[in-house]
Amino acid sequence: MSVNPGDFYVVSGAPSSGKSVLLRIVLGLEPADAGSVYLGGKDVTSKGPQERHVGYVPQSFALFPNKSVRENILYPMRLDKVGKVEMQETLDRVCDLLAIEDLLDKRPDQLSGGQKQRTAIARGLAKQTDFFVLDDPLVGLDFKLRERLIDDLKATRSALGVTFLYSTSDSLESLLLASRVGVLADGGISEEGDLDEVYDTPQAASSMQALGFPSANLVDGDVRSVGSSKMCSTVLGDVEVSGDVAPGPVLVGIRSEHVQVGTAREGAV
């Protein structure tokens, strides 16, 4: 997996596919079984979380219940011994970006679910770094709130000019947020690249299913040569094949948004 500066890189995969474990390895919270972790071109595989200087927004709200919103957001900056002026400037910036200025004196038990998540995101973004890891931060929220927070996250990343590594099992989130995407399947990244590239020309069935709203339908097919062209036979009928596809069994992905309704022809299903 390779994340470039300025990316909104989304790790997309089914629930329990290992997304959180992968992110925790990047953060230094879990050891890697093999391979190395590089941040900013430096090998940090043996470094602990504090030495990696990565901002983190976990899946759960994980707020201190006895501290105000203000103190929750200031906490990572106090750990990093940030100066008072810079702390206040950062607090003002993240609160303005996430529209939570009026919540600063409230405790978590006085907040709605959306306000708690905004506070958790603000605390993660208060870390003095240009690289942030967000582990499925919108899971469990209703659609309208998720839609609003998706807009907030895109605007925040753009305004700060930072890099986001984000995980989700929700294909719509992947499509709305990612500039680059890595599809996690069978214990590894099965495919990665620019979102448009992976969506338009997927090289793995896992990509077809992870990126789509709804997910693509997969059917078995068989490619055969017919004169100078190639045809693929499926239970849905025959279709001409373009590109460099070898004759033989294949898996055909059908996206519902690419299906057109027309007049039935002979042999159609």
Predicted features and spans:
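Conserved coupling/switch loops of ABC nucleotide-binding domains, chiefly the family-specific signature
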Residues: 33-36, 186
